[in-house]
Amino acid sequence: MEIEIKVENIKNPPEKVRLMYEAVSQLLKGDRELSSIKVQDITQKAGIGKGTAYEYFSSKEEIIANALMFEYANKIALLVESAFKEKDFKKRCYKIMDWLCENKDYNMMFKHLFRMNAGLQAEPPMEKLEECEPGNFGYEAYQYVCQIIDEFMEDGYVQGAFTETDKRKRCLAILTAMIQYAVLITCQIGAHYEIMSDKEMREAVYTNMIKSLN
């Protein structure tokens, strides 16, 4: 099964929106907590006026959520394109884990996205996030990510790697597996995991994912 990944398939945001997305990325890579970031921080970093942000978004939560999704849509597109150079589904999954291991800064950004969606950010509470509807830019990026994952997992099914046919369950399985691996290598929780080598962690993560799909 052939797949053609083109990052330009994601709608290019207006220049000022792109600058805000880049500003959010830079702030989070600097170890800022989501709750500490203000709209003014974003616009100053982006080099635009504060009022400009509200021409495109209704809140800082909406800016951050869209920025994280757009960032990952682009990174995932490039990552899957690289992974598809491998013919074997398992090797493709390992390729993704290679990337996660080499790009821990993006793992931390994904942690922020996960916490926002799970409602775990509590200092201060970010209740407005749950009320945010997908914006034009973030929603298109979200749809693109879903399409990429669907095609990636369908190829695994065609290869006979698993038997699950439900696309939602496939998507949940691969995302859960990669989040699990990212947490293990990023947080470095301590002695409990020191008995496992990176090879053992990858094998365990992959094996558990396949079991959940059979």
Spans of model-derived segments:
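Amphipathic alpha-helical segments used for helix-helix packing
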Residues: 103-132, 183-188
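Basic, helix-initiating cap at the start of DNA-binding domains
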Residues: 1-45
